[in-house]
């Protein structure tokens, strides 16, 4: 998608970018309200996730992650903005009259045809089991459990690669660098998720960040000692510790957060980077 650069003398919007080719008028039957409870607070109102709060009200778009319209071709009608994710979404009009949203594959344009099922062509946007895909295929929206819907590689620009097949399992290299096993009966969509350059987008001002529900981030080194372990000192002082820590004194970088003895450990051949 082409990005438009604001040309304005106003400092607040200078060098901000916006995509003019993406619409934002969703279908009424494919949206519903969703209460954003807490916004970083727990049931007692205490902040448990920092730098969250506010933001514009959102309507949730019902995305078809299952792709269970078997052997029915559909046509891309619109490419729309979704406030609930970084990736764009496509409105698909199927031959039987059904309309559904899917994640926008990179390079797909209005008028393209997609289909899901077994023995379908290996082309962008088509969904089929891993057993029918050749090695080296770039895929996204990958199921972990058959029929549960895609759960892996769904963010903007995400793409995984099918690198091996042995027995009933397929080996995938995920965007994080993790190499894991998945059943060959699981569905996946061919191609890469669109909106690849979302991390290079310039919002132009702090207010645009607040509309997304993200509050300002303050460095611990500029706080007082009562507020952060990095705080205090005369002038611009270092953190005074061997390693950076969280506001509560725990290691901030490099600490593993995955649970030990998880059921899926046997399917992970190499951990993420």
From Swiss-Prot:
Gene Ontology BP, a term: mitochondrial translation
Domain of life (superkingdom): Eukaryota
GO cellular component: chloroplast; mitochondrial large ribosomal subunit
Chief site of localization: plastid
Swiss-Prot/TrEMBL keywords: Chloroplast, Plastid, Ribonucleoprotein, Ribosomal protein
PROSITE patterns: RIBOSOMAL_L2
InterPro entries tied to this protein: NA-bd_OB-fold (IPR012340), Rib_uL2_dom2 (IPR014722), Ribosomal_uL2 (IPR002171), Ribosomal_uL2_bac/org-type (IPR005880), Ribosomal_uL2_C (IPR022669), Ribosomal_uL2_CS (IPR022671), Ribosomal_uL2_dom3 (IPR014726), Ribosomal_uL2_RNA-bd_dom (IPR022666)
Cellular localization per UniProt: Plastid, Chloroplast
Region Disordered, residue ranges: 1-22, 225-273
Gene Ontology MF terms: RNA binding; rRNA binding; structural constituent of ribosome; transferase activity
Subunit details: Part of the 50S ribosomal subunit.
HAMAP family xref list: Ribosomal_uL2_B
Family statement: Belongs to the universal ribosomal protein uL2 family.
Protein name per its UniProtKB record: Large ribosomal subunit protein uL2cz/uL2cy
Source species of the chain: Zea mays (Maize)
């Amino acid at each position: 998608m082409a990005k438009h650069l604001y040309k304005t003398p106003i400092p607040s919007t200078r060098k901000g970018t916006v995509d003019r080719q993406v619409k934002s008028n969703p279908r009424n039957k494919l949206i519903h309200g969703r209460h954003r409870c807490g916004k970083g607070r727990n049931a007692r109102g205490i902040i448990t996730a920092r730098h969250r709060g506010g933001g514009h009200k959102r309507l949730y778009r019902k995305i078809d992650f299952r792709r269970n319209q078997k052997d029915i071709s559909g046509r891309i009608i619109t490419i729309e903005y979704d406030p609930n994710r970084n990736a764009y979404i496509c409105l698909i009009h199927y031959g039987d009259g059904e309309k559904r949203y899917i994640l926008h594959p990179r390079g797909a344009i209005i008028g393209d045809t997609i289909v899901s099922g077994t023995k379908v062509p290996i082309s962008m946007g088509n969904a089929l089991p891993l057993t029918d895909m050749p090695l080296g295929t770039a895929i996204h929206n990958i199921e972990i459990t058959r029929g549960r819907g895609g759960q892996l590689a769904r963010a903007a620009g995400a793409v995984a690669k099918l690198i091996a097949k042995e027995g009933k399992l397929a080996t995938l290299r995920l965007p994080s660098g993790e190499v894991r096993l998945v059943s060959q009966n699981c569905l996946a969509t061919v191609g890469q998720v669109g909106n690849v350059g979302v991390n290079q987008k310039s919002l132009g001002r702090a207010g645009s960040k607040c509309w997304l529900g993200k509050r300002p981030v303050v460095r611990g080194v500029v706080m007082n000692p009562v507020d952060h372990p990095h705080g205090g000192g005369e002038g611009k002082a270092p953190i005074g510790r061997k390693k950076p820590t969280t506001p509560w004194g725990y290691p901030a970088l490099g600490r593993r957060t995955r649970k030990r003895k998880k059921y899926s450990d046997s399917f992970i051949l190499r951990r993420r980077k």
